A protein has these predicted regions:
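Bacterial N-terminal signal peptides
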Residues: 8-15
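Sec/Tat signal peptide C-region and signal peptidase I cleavage site
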Residues: 16-21
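Extracellular beta-strand elements of beta-rich domains used
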Residues: 28, 272-279
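Carbohydrate-binding surfaces in secreted/extracellular proteins
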Residues: 28, 115, 177-239
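Extracellular glycan-recognition surfaces and repeat-rich motifs
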Residues: 36-84
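Secretory/extracellular carbohydrate-interaction modules
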Residues: 76-157
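Short, aromatic/His-centered strand-loop micro-motif at the edge of beta-sheets
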Residues: 160-184
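Flexible glycan-contacting loops in extracellular carbohydrate-active proteins
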Residues: 215-275
Length: 288
């Protein structure tokens, strides 16, 4: 009996560090990609290469569909398939579109992530992004989520980051995103605390178009080149960059939290290649 218990705890100690650093990934390579509604069958609930999730995909509002198109960017890994998120149709407007999935493990310290998107239309009253929130958050929007990474915010052509309603950081310069173009959104959370603890944390977000993303992918150090880049539209620049320090914060990325693809005021926006990593920015963007 003692031998069995010792064996169990030995295996647990081996697996635990890997679990804490487990990568979260979704490339939307579902078994059925023929413009099929997300989560409508067993073949449309999880990607075949997805990992790090504690649930299948759930639809809360709007109409998400799975498409065979892949948001490929030169220099980065990618699998076939993507999620087309369609906002809820209202009499005189287009409401929210939300597809969400629960992550398995939590992260402490520095955490890196990314996602790709391509929007069919971008109007002043539209917004999109990736939201990280507690389960059951109601209402769920850009300022109620625990963390928000939004390359296009409502009321502006630029993006924003947020850690709740009182900690919103808005971009006012750089290059605005344009319709029918693919973008890579890269984010980093620095110094995340353990559950129940407080410490200063830092939020970072970069928005890159295809040429910019491929340029940084070609560099010897993706992270160093990205951090040194200036704002602008040239390949060696970044379209948008935001940074915000929040002191004495209890906010973190804990096991069981929910990652949501979010849009409002948008008829169609395509999401793809969602990644969260403990390793590095290079790992979080899927450098090939």
């Amino acid at each position: 009996m003692k031998t069995q218990i010792l064996f169990f705890f030995t295996i647990l100690l081996i697996l635990l560090p890997k679990a804490v650093c487990a990568e979260v990934y979704e490339g939307f390579d579902m078994a059925d990609l023929n413009s099929t509604p997300l989560a409508s069958s067993d073949a449309t609930r999880v990607g075949m290469t997805s990992s790090g999730w504690n649930s299948t995909w759930q639809v809360t509002i709007g109409k998400p569909f799975l498409e065979p198109i892949d948001l490929e960017i030169k220099g980065f890994d990618s699998v076939g398939g993507s999620l087309e998120l369609r906002g809820e149709r209202k009499p005189n407007s287009i409401g929210q579109g939300v597809a969400m999935r629960q992550i398995t493990e939590g992260f402490i310290g520095d955490v890196y992530g990314s996602f790709r998107f391509n929007a069919k239309a971008l109007k002043i009253e539209s917004a999109l992004g990736l939201l990280l929130s507690l389960p059951g958050q109601n209402p769920l929007n850009l300022t109620t989520a625990t963390f928000t990474f939004c390359p296009k915010r409502w009321g502006s052509e630029y993006g924003m980051m947020a850690a709740g309603k009182e900690r919103v950081t808005k971009s006012e310069t750089g290059e605005a995103c344009v319709p029918n173009a693919s973008y890579l959104v890269v984010w980093q959370l620095e110094n995340l605390p353990k559950l129940g603890k407080r410490q200063s944390i830092i939020l970072n977000m970069w928005v890159l178009d295809e040429k910019q993303a491929s340029y940084f992918a070609s560099k010897n150090s993706f992270e160093s080149a990205l951090r040194l880049a200036e704002l602008g539209s040239e390949p060696e620049q970044v379209g948008q960059y935001l940074r915000r320090e929040i002191k004495n914060s209890k906010r973190g990325l804990f096991g069981g939290m929910v990652a949501s693809c979010f849009s409002v005021g948008m008829p169609k926006v395509t999401f793809d290649e969602i990644r969260i990593s403990k390793e590095s920015l290079a790992d979080a963007v899927g450098l090939s």
